[in-house]
Regions:
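Class I SAM-dependent methyltransferase SAM/SAH-binding core
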Residues: 45, 52-98
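A short glycine-rich, Lys/Arg-flanked "PGG" loop and its adjoining helix->strand segment in the class I
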Residues: 125-137
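Conserved class I S-adenosyl-L-methionine
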Residues: 1-40
Length: 251
């Protein structure tokens, strides 16, 4: 399934509609986990970095950041933030399924359910293998994924809509239990100077993976699972957890 057409026009208002996401708490958790493994500086890759919000948080903490994303529109937003902050961040327009770096990094992070956009098992295994290839020995990979429970009971087959002065969107979800694929149909309405609205439509796909399947693919890629947590905690995931944070290591 070709899902990596990803964010286009929505990139312009992505941050506005994500203003309910507590990136600072998320970033604090990542920094704590990195520090616990003795990684307090050096190169860190943000895989599927989007508009660079988390990339900036980690750069502010002293890490030398690389951001990879397949959406030029999202990276354009990220580079505007880079100009404002003055952080020396390298952004690369690459598909996470085929990304290439000039060398290894001490850690890789991937947030905002970016890996759920990988809809085929062999492709997710390949991404894990690429991460393993570019990690320093004993490097770590921290990522989150939406759970099966979240797609089944929280967002699957629901419609989310929001209206603001800066724009409006309608986000329709359709979850297929058999394939584990959640289809997002997004309609975006952005006001123009003439008082009319510009409409843009995008379709995205994400897949729900069981924790058992994720563990299996991590092992096949040659990495070691260290821990799985409920979102932003050090507690194990619950049956009704919507987001799992996963901590794995390059042996």
């Amino acid at each position: 399934m070709d899902n990596f057409q990803a964010y286009g026009e929505f990139a312009r208002v992505y941050d506005m509609f994500q203003d309910n996401v507590d990136y600072q708490t998320w970033g604090k958790w990542l920094k704590q986990q990195l520090a616990a493994q003795g990684i307090t500086d050096g190169l860190v890759l943000d895989l599927g970095c989007g508009t660079g919000t988390m990339t900036e948080i980690l750069a502010e903490a002293g890490y030398d950041m690389i951001g990879v994303d397949n959406s030029g529109e999202m990276l354009a937003e990220a580079m505007e933030k880079r100009v404002e902050s003055g952080h020396d961040i390298l952004y690369l327009l690459q598909d996470m399924q085929e990304f290439e770096l000039y060398g290894t990094v001490r850690a890789v992070v991937s947030v905002c359910d970016s890996l759920n956009y990988i809809t085929e098992e062999e492709e997710l295994e390949h991404v894990f293998a690429l991460v393993n290839n570019y990690l320093d020995p004993q490097g770590i990979f921290l990522f989150d994924m939406n759970t099966v429970y979240k797609y089944q009971t929280m967002i699957g087959n629901t419609t989310i809509a929001e209206n603001r002065d800066e724009g409006s969107f309608i986000w329709e979800n359709s979850y297929d239990e058999e394939t584990g694929i959640n289809t997002y149909e997004l309609a975006l309405f952005i006001p123009r100077e003439d008082g009319l609205y510009e409409k843009d439509e995008e379709v995205h796909y994400q897949r729900a993976y069981s924790l058992e399947k994720i563990k299996e693919l991590i092992g096949k890629a040659g990495m070691e699972l260290l821990a799985v947590y409920d979102a932003y905690t050090l507690e194990p995931p619950k049956e009704d957890s919507g987001l799992s944070l996963i901590h794995i290591s390059e042996p």
